[in-house]
Amino acid sequence: MKKATLTFLLILTTIISCNEASEEISGPSYDRGTLLNNWYIYSIQPRLSEFKSKIDMMEVASNEFKIKKDNASLNILREKYVDAHMAWQRVEMINIGKAEEIYYNSKMNVYPVNVARVTANISSGTYDFNNANNNAAQGFPTIDYMLYGLDESDEKIIEVYANDDNYANYL
């Protein structure tokens, strides 16, 4: 008797759940174009502008360091590097459009840096940053290595740049 009741309830539940009068599910009632435009204007564009500004300031500091090769200009360059890297962290997720086409995120922040490739590129004086093999020899980790990892002391790092212009050119 229990089996028959259980079977009857199971069949009844199946029939009720298979109702053909289903409602058509409609999409959201808001305009996605307006949402995306708003996202671009108030989120993406300001962050990209900030990133470009920070990169430009880092480039100015880098050029200043290449000329002066002193402790003060190295510290300014390091400060601008940190600012630019922080700005990069805010735009890295925006991998759309031209950035996606040129694999910008693969060129900007590949970790770990390939120190052997960086050293080979600097020694040869010729390198192609469009070559995918150089992705781990460019970008922020490479700049980090060149500003902090060439030696233990700032004086020795400055000496490396003073003795070999290829290092300054690569930076």
Label every model-predicted segment.
Residues 1-2, 116:
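Short, intrinsically disordered low-complexity segments
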Residues 2-9:
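Sec-dependent signal peptide recognition
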Residues 14-17:
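C-terminal motif of bacterial Sec signal peptides marking the signal peptidase cleavage site
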Residues 19-22:
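Bacterial signal peptide processing site
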Residues 24-171:
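Mature extracytoplasmic or organellar-lumen-exposed domains after removal of signal/transit peptides
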